[in-house]
UniProtKB/Swiss-Prot annotation:
It catalyses: 3-deoxy-alpha-D-manno-oct-2-ulosonate + CTP = CMP-3-deoxy-beta-D-manno-octulosonate + diphosphate. The lineage of its organism: Bacteria, Pseudomonadati, Pseudomonadota, Alphaproteobacteria, Hyphomicrobiales. It is an enzyme of class 2 (transferase). GO terms for molecular function: 3-deoxy-manno-octulosonate cytidylyltransferase activity. One of its GO terms (biological process) is CMP-keto-3-deoxy-D-manno-octulosonic acid biosynthetic process. Its EC number is 2.7.7.38. NCBIfam families: kdsB (TIGR00466), PRK05450.1-1 (NF003948), PRK05450.1-5 (NF003952). Belongs to the KdsB family. Activates KDO (a required 8-carbon sugar) for incorporation into bacterial lipopolysaccharide in Gram-negative bacteria. Pathway: Nucleotide-sugar biosynthesis; CMP-3-deoxy-D-manno-octulosonate biosynthesis; CMP-3-deoxy-D-manno-octulosonate from 3-deoxy-D-manno-octulosonate and CTP: step 1/1; Bacterial outer membrane biogenesis; lipopolysaccharide biosynthesis. This is 3-deoxy-manno-octulosonate cytidylyltransferase. Pfam families: CTP_transf_3 (PF02348). PANTHER family: 3-DEOXY-MANNO-OCTULOSONATE CYTIDYLYLTRANSFERASE, 3-DEOXY-MANNO-OCTULOSONATE CYTIDYLYLTRANSFERASE, MITOCHONDRIAL.
């Protein structure tokens, strides 16, 4: 399935070697391929026509290049993935042909193609600067877990929220659904250019959530509601889960 909007988009996948819980994470073997290559394959399955991996390590660069994907070496001192993908964007698309920039985290080797495609849907509304994803929380423990970021949003439809806030606490108060934020973003190119030039904001620093910088600057973020949270690989246990998931499907 090809999404016509992918013709106007570039998928950028940041990869960093510096992981304290899982050293060498981008090169971890999953199904005979490095994890970062598995993520790029998921983007290809979603219908992406231009996929660029942004790396800070020669070994990762070589692994991605050998797999046939575009790869850009970036500086090692970036403070965030957004800064890294912006540097890669400037190198990969210097003439500004891409209207949308999809930031897929490099530790999501089992992400579903439909989940990636869903991040483009809010861009149908020209007022939206940034799109992201969310899932309704069904696990009671997640509702109070500060490691599960919640989207506080105003419903626009059964499948979309306008994000008003992101928080690690349990919110909003009262009866009704709570939503687990998925850190995959689609930016309008101009919005990404604006975002990376903004200084860290007070709420961003307080909650330790980069996306609050955009909201505090008056940018609009809409969140598409999807079916499930993709597995983020941060620990050896996560890595084993990812291996089992991909072993059960045809690659």
């Amino acid at each position: 399935m090809k999404n016509r909007d992918f013709e106007k988009a570039v998928v950028l996948i940041p990869a960093r070697m510096a992981s304290t819980r899982l050293p060498g994470k981008p090169l971890a073997d999953i199904g005979g391929r490095p994890m970062i290559v598995q993520v790029a394959l998921r983007a290809r399955e979603a219908g992406a026509e231009r996929i660029v991996v942004a790396v800070d390590d020669e070994q990762v660069f070589a692994a991605v290049q050998n797999a046939g994907f575009d790869v850009m070496m970036t500086r090692g001192d970036h403070q965030s993935g957004s800064d890294r993908i912006f540097e890669a964007l400037q190198k990969a698309d210097p003439y500004g042909k891409a209207e949308y920039v999809i930031n897929v985290q490099g530790d999501l080797p089992t992400i579903e193609a439909e989940t990636i495609r869903a991040s483009l849907r809010p861009m149908e509304n020209a007022a939206v600067d940034i799109a992201t994803l969310t899932v309704e929380i069904t696990d009671e423990e997640e509702k109070t877990n500060p490691n599960v970021v919640k989207v506080v949003g105003s419903p626009l439809s059964e499948t979309r929220l306008r994000a008003l806030y992101f928080t690690r606490t349990t919110a909003p108060y009262g009866d009704g659904p709570l939503y687990h934020h998925i850190g995959l973003y689609t930016y309008r190119r101009a919005a990404l250019e604006t975002f990376v030039r903004l200084p860290p904001s007070p709420l961003e620093l307080r909650e330790r959530l980069e996306q609050l910088r955009a909201l505090e600057a008056g940018m609009r973020i809409d969140a598409e509601i999807v079916r499930s949270v993709p597995l983020g690989v941060d620990t050896p246990h996560d890595l084993e889960k990812a291996r089992k998931i991909l072993a059960g499907r045809t690659l």
